[in-house]
């Protein structure tokens, strides 16, 4: 076992996703069963007391890998020496709120967090933004951390990726483990494009295995893209445990690598691949090795896929222009 604990900062730690996430991190599921962790919980002042209650529960669980828990309401202190940051806390969209108001409110959260990461985080910092609008929140944070390599800022589309695997496995009546090379393209929003044309199921193309283009276009894609809204309607609250599980998956894969013969999906800064403007934080098919994500190259895209990707990328570009106009980047 490594003797030096990894510092993991979780924002919005008193929320439902935070609660579902923290115990799994402390148990070793984020980084592995031989890596001790120190948890640093960041909350707004009015939620610090609740976060302190979660810290007491974490202590009571006596996790062998948990080297300590600290609670903060100051971003500079919370990110001091941090190796892994999960930015979960964000301002949710409320009824009647315009998109500009939402972006502005989240800019007030992610700008200072980016600055705090820039000034105090460890040199090997890795950042995953979970709080929505995740791609653009990640862009805001990354812009305000100019001394941190841009590739260290990512946004989560692993939940969409996992949802796509689950829906395809259910349709075909196979275990989810048999589904390989699913891709989520673009924004973590209703415009995202879940792509099964390069997926593999028992050696066959996912689309060929389904054999029903109408199901792909009219049921699969909207079901995955709008699954969050479906869960809110059924559960009466937003996805929490599944979002936490996807965040664990994202970081674990980033640190430990993708399995041979497979890839995953992550929103990372574009290098211009597949016509996505450079610098946009967009979801791509990626592999991970040596602690780095790499975009899978050379995939052929038909007109259907190209149209779907372009629509989501346009939305990302519009969000970037909106936060630029607000002076947030």
Swiss-Prot record:
What is catalysed by this protein?
(S)-malate + NAD(+) = oxaloacetate + NADH + H(+)
Among SUPFAM superfamilies, the record links this protein to: LDH C-terminal domain-like, NAD(P)-binding Rossmann-fold domains
The EC number of this protein is 1.1.1.37
List keywords of the entry alphabetically: NAD, Oxidoreductase, Tricarboxylic acid cycle
Look up the domain of life of the source: Bacteria
| Active site per UniProt | 188 (proton acceptor)
Q: What is this protein called?
A: Malate dehydrogenase
Q: Which organism is it from?
A: Frankia casuarinae (strain DSM 45818 / CECT 9043 / HFP020203 / CcI3)
Gene encoding the protein: mdh
């Amino acid at each position: 076992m490594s003797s030096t604990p990894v510092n993991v900062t979780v924002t919005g730690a008193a929320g439902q996703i935070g609660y579902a996430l923290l115990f799994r991190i402390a148990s070793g599921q984020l980084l592995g069963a031989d890596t001790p962790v120190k948890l640093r919980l960041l909350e707004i002042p009015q939620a610090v007391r609740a976060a302190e209650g979660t810290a007491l529960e974490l202590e009571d669980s006596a996790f062998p890998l948990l080297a300590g828990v600290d609670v903060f309401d100051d971003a500079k202190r919370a990110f001091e020496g941090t190796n892994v940051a999960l930015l979960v806390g964000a301002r949710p969209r409320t009824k009647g709120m315009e998109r500009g108001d939402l972006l502005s409110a989240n800019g007030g959260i992610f700008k200072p967090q980016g600055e705090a990461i820039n000034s105090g985080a460890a040199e090997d910092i890795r950042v995953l933004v979970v709080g929505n609008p995740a791609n653009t929140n990640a862009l805001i944070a990354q812009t305000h951390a100019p001394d941190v390599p841009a590739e260290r800022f990512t946004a989560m589309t692993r939940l969409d990726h996992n949802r796509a695997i689950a829906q395809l496995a259910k349709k075909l009546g196979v275990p989810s483990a048999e589904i390989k090379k699913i891709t989520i393209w673009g924004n973590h929003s209703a415009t995202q494009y879940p792509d099964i044309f390069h997926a593999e199921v028992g050696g066959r193309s996912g689309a060929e295995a389904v054999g029903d283009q109408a199901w792909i276009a009219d049921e699969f894609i909207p079901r995955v893209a709008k699954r969050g809204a479906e869960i809110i309607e059924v559960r009466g609250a937003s996805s929490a445990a599944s979002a936490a599980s996807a965040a664990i998956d994202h970081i674990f894969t980033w640190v430990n690598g993708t399995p041979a013969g497979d890839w995953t999906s992550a929103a990372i800064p574009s290098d211009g691949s597949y016509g996505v403007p450079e610098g946009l934080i967009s979801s791509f098919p990626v592999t991970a090795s040596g602690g780095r994500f790499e975009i899978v190259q050379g995939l052929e895209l038909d007109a259907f896929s190209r149209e779907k990707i372009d629509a989501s990328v346009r939305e990302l570009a519009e969000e970037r222009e909106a936060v630029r106009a607000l002076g947030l980047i």
